C-alpha cells in the first residue's frame, strides 16, 4: 500500500515522502497514529500544493535576507564604552548590545545569535562583524566603538 508520510518514521521514510509499505503496517500503525495518510489522488495533489507553498516561502525568505544584507552593509552601528590605556575596553561589547543599538538607531531587528562574534569586541575603533542572515546569505555589519566621555 502506498502512503504519504506526515512525519519522519525511523527506518521507513521522511516527512512528505511517498512510499510503499505493507497494508497491515499502514492501517494498524502509520495511519492509526497519524504518521501517514493513504496515497490517493487528492492527498498527492495536496502534498504537491504544500511543496509548492514551501518552495515559494523559501524563495521569499531568501529574497528578504538578501535585501536585509544590502541594508546592513550600508550601515554603521555606533556604540560607546569605557576604555583604558591603548584603546582597550573595560569588558567587551557583546552581540546583544550591538543588536539593541541596531534596533534603537535604525529600527532593524536582528537576532543576536545571528551575529558571529564569539568573544565580543574588546577594542575601540571599527570592527566588521559577520551576520548570518540565511544559510546562503551572510552580511558584514560595521560596528564603531567610541570612547565614552
UniProtKB/Swiss-Prot annotation:
Record keyword Ribonucleoprotein present: yes
GO molecular function term, any single one: rRNA binding
Record lineage: Bacteria, Bacillati, Bacillota, Bacilli, Bacillales
Leader peptide range in chain numbering: none
Full protein name: Large ribosomal subunit protein bL9
Cellular component terms (Gene Ontology): cytosolic large ribosomal subunit
Superkingdom of origin organism: Bacteria
Annotated InterPro entries: Ribosomal_bL9, Ribosomal_bL9/RNase_H1_N, Ribosomal_bL9_bac/chp, Ribosomal_bL9_C, Ribosomal_bL9_C_sf, Ribosomal_bL9_N, Ribosomal_bL9_N_sf
Biological processes, Gene Ontology terms: translation
Cross-referenced NCBIfam families: L9 (TIGR00158)
Species name: Bacillus subtilis (strain 168)
Keywords, comma-separated and alphabetical: Ribonucleoprotein, Ribosomal protein, RNA-binding, rRNA-binding
Family: Belongs to the bacterial ribosomal protein bL9 family.
Role: Binds to the 23S rRNA.
A Pfam family reported for this protein in Swiss-Prot or TrEMBL: Ribosomal_L9_C
